[in-house]
A protein has these predicted regions:
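Short, small/polar-rich loop/turn modules that mediate ligand/substrate recognition or access, typified
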Residues: 172, 177, 247-249
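Active-site helix of classical SDR
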Residues: 120, 156, 164
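Alpha-helical segment proximal to the catalytic Tyr-Lys
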Residues: 125, 169-170, 245
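Substrate-binding pocket helix/loop in short-chain dehydrogenase/reductase
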Residues: 95-97, 101-109, 217
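C-terminal helical subdomain
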Residues: 180, 203-243, 247, 254-256, ...
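Conserved glycine-rich cofactor-binding loop
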Residues: 8, 15-16
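Residue(s) in the substrate-gating loop at a strand-loop-helix junction
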Residues: 140
Length: 287
């Protein structure tokens, strides 16, 4: 029996990148999936590619009525809701605090935090009646470690992680599990957009992001290869499945080790300099 046989999932931001790959994995494992995005042409084409197990609904997740309609669509089309994956995102350029644009901040929060709460709200109403369900929010290592990403994005992701824990404490008694995934540097169009590429070009050429990430992996990441969308999709599969039935309130970090510390290979030159400096400062040391 396939892992998600008979289950129904809604995945926001699923017309490209992590969301699209997760939809493919879920369908392959037996789920019915609602594809969610703003680009109708791309979404309809992707749903057709996945076949009868998929349906597309155009949604702006920053609009609460759209989020409700998205959940209603899943229930009307497939009869139930077993998993909501809050994955939609928007690019956010780095800005220094003194030049902060509060309108831009609000726009980022609307997608990365407010939409997460809206999704939880309407998914929980359905799942509570069923007595079971899994809500997954795609957060980021920027939500647990400062300095890697923009302030707006990082703050919203940090809040989404804590919202996940709060929701887990409330919804557990209703049989609903709530967890988050914090990806590291993953080769996606979203990453390429953050690096300044145009949206269409970025979505169609994730290999550009992979090349950029490859240039810093040796210094930043203990695992010496580039994270890919399938790494996150497989993590989502675990959290959506019954294999994670005893997991809730957890932020599952999938980042190649970036957030764990500083790679030994990267730190070695500084460590050697540190010891040479100590030796040179000792009394009687010969230059």
């Amino acid at each position: 029996m396939r892992t998600l046989e008979g289950k129904v999932a809604v995945i926001t931001g699923s017309t490209s990148g992590i969301g699209a790959r997760t939809a493919e994995v879920f369908v392959a494992e037996g789920a019915k999936v609602v594809i969610v995005g703003r680009r109708e042409d791309r979404g309809e084409a992707f749903a057709r590619k996945l076949g009868d197990a998929a349906s597309f609904v155009r949604t702006d997740v920053s609009v609460e009525a759209d989020v409700k309609a998205m959940i209603d669509h899943a229930v009307d089309r497939f009869g139930r809701l077993d998993c909501l994956m809050n994955n939609a995102g928007r690019s956010s350029q780095y800005a220094v605090i003194a030049d902060a644009d509060l309108e831009q901040f609000d726009a980022v929060v609307a997608v990365h935090l407010r939409a997460v709460l809206a999704g939880m709200k309407y998914a929980a109403r359905v799942m509570a009646v069923q007595g079971t369900g899994s809500i997954i929010t795609v957060a980021s290592i920027n939500g647990i470690r400062a300095g890697l990403g923009g302030h707006y994005y990082s703050a919203a992701k940090a809040a989404s992680i804590h919202l996940t824990r709060c929701a887990a404490m409330e919804l557990g008694e209703k049989g609903i599990r709530v967890n988050s995934i914090s990806p590291g540097m993953i080769a996606t169009g979203a990453f390429a957009k953050y690096m300044g590429m145009q949206p269409d070009e970025a979505d169609d050429h994730p290999e550009y992001a992979e090349a950029a990430i490859s240039s810093v992996v040796p210094r930043w990441q203990p695992l010496q290869y580039v994270g890919r969308v399938d790494d996150i999709a497989q993590t989502a599969l675990f959290l959506a499945s019954d294999a994670s039935r005893f997991v809730t309130g957890h932020n599952l970090v999938v980042d190649g080790g970036i957030s764990a510390g500083w790679p030994i290979a990267a730190a070695r030159p500084d460590r050697e300099l540190f010891f040479r400096t100590i030796q040179a400062s000792r009394p009687g040391h010969a230059a």
